[in-house]
Design a protein with these regions (language model features):
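Short acidic-hydrophobic, aromatic-tinged amphipathic segments that line or gate anion-handling sites
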Residues: 1-9, 78-79
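N-terminal catalytic cores of NTP/NDP-binding nucleotidyl/phosphoryl-transfer enzymes
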Residues: 8-63, 67
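Short histidine/acidic/glycine/proline-rich micro-motifs that form metal-
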Residues: 25-26, 52-56, 82-85, 111-116, ...
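Residues at the starts of beta-strands that form the adenosine-phosphate
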Residues: 43-46, 75-76, 104-105, 132
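Glycine-rich, highly charged phosphate/nucleotide-binding loops
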Residues: 58-65, 86-94
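A glycine-rich helix N-cap at a beta->alpha junction
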Residues: 65-66, 70-80
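Classical nucleotidyltransferase
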Residues: 88-191, 214, 269-273
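Phosphate/ribose-recognition catalytic cores of enzymes acting on nucleotide-derived substrates
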Residues: 180-289
Length: 289
């Protein structure tokens, strides 16, 4: 079922609609150029996102994407279930968008493809619509195109600082803290434990410097994403120690931002050896601007 999610209340459709075309699994640097162009004419800005696509895990969950889009200044998201649109011809796809929103502007990248067998192109849009069409060149960083595929490759390698260059913000997850075995508390490092969201593309397992916001305050910290071999626990979790925080986070939803990769996960000979390493990890984090 097609679904429109309004990110701001009481939209005024008389403003017109500028529609961004693409997959929009989050917003990378190229997408943000499209958004800037769409906002130039004072219209409402909408973008589409594909739900349940053929490319496997997404970079962000639906709530995470909506947060990114809203913070970037978009007004609405048009959610398109892949199963419902995969057989539409390019013309049928274009007609669907015009029927739903009567846009006065389409904005896309030069590599945008759509419709059955991806036969639709920016030139096709220009030929078959009377709507203004803006086609922007691809954005490159260090000589390589910015894309979701590139971001996923970097995540698989733990290169989250380069991911930030591509996304223009830190890679993050949002999840609810649950009560676990409280091993961290026992050794002096209480952690907020979150299950990695189902369907979200996994980053490389390891220990990361992270930033977590609680009640409007950002806390530096360290996050173990993966198993806990020192305690013979192979469950994959996201365990975050918030430096300087005291309080109960159970049941609360947290946003954890991954700042940089610190080290691989390893099995220590004892809890004391692990504690010594964690103290070294947090010292590195405190000294990092």
């Amino acid at each position: 079922m097609l679904k429109t999610v309004w990110l701001n209340e009481q939209p005024n459709m008389k403003q017109g609609v500028a529609m961004l075309l693409g997959g929009f699994d989050g917003l990378h640097a190229g997408h943000r150029k499209l958004l800037e162009k769409a906002k130039e004419n004072g219209s409402l800005v909408g973008l589409m996102t594909i739900i349940g696509g053929k490319n496997g895990e997404s970079l962000f969950t639906n709530p995470e994407r909506e947060l990114i889009f809203k913070e970037a200044g978009a007004d609405f998201v048009f959610e398109l279930p892949f199963a419902e649109i995969k057989n539409l011809s390019p013309l049928e796809f274009l007609q669907m968008l015009e029927r739903e929103f009567s846009p006065n502007m389409f904005v896309c990248g030069e590599d945008f493809r759509f419709g059955l067998q991806a036969k639709g192109t920016p030139n096709f849009i220009k030929e078959y619509t009377q709507v203004r069409v803006e086609v922007l060149p691809l954005v490159e960083i260090n000589g390589e195109k910015v894309s979701a595929t590139r971001v996923k490759r970097l995540l698989s390698e733990g290169r989250v600082e380069e991911v930030k260059q591509c996304l223009t913000h830190d890679f993050f997850l949002i999840g609810e803290v649950f009560a676990d075995r409280k091993i961290g508390r026992i050794i002096g490092f209480p952690t907020a434990n979150i299950l990695y969201p189902k369907g979200k593309y996994p980053l490389k397992k390891g220990v990361y410097e992270t930033r977590t916001v609680v009640n409007g305050k950002a806390y530096k910290g360290i996050t173990n994403y993966g198993a806990r071999p020192t305690f013979d626990d192979e469950t994959v979790l996201t365990e975050t120690y918030l430096d300087g925080f005291s309080g109960d986070l159970y049941g609360k939803s947290l946003k954890v931002e991954f700042v940089r990769f610190l080290r691989e996960i390893k099995k220590f000979d004892s809890a004391e050896a692990l504690k010594k390493q964690l103290n070294e990890d947090i010292a590195r984090v405190r000294n990092h601007d």
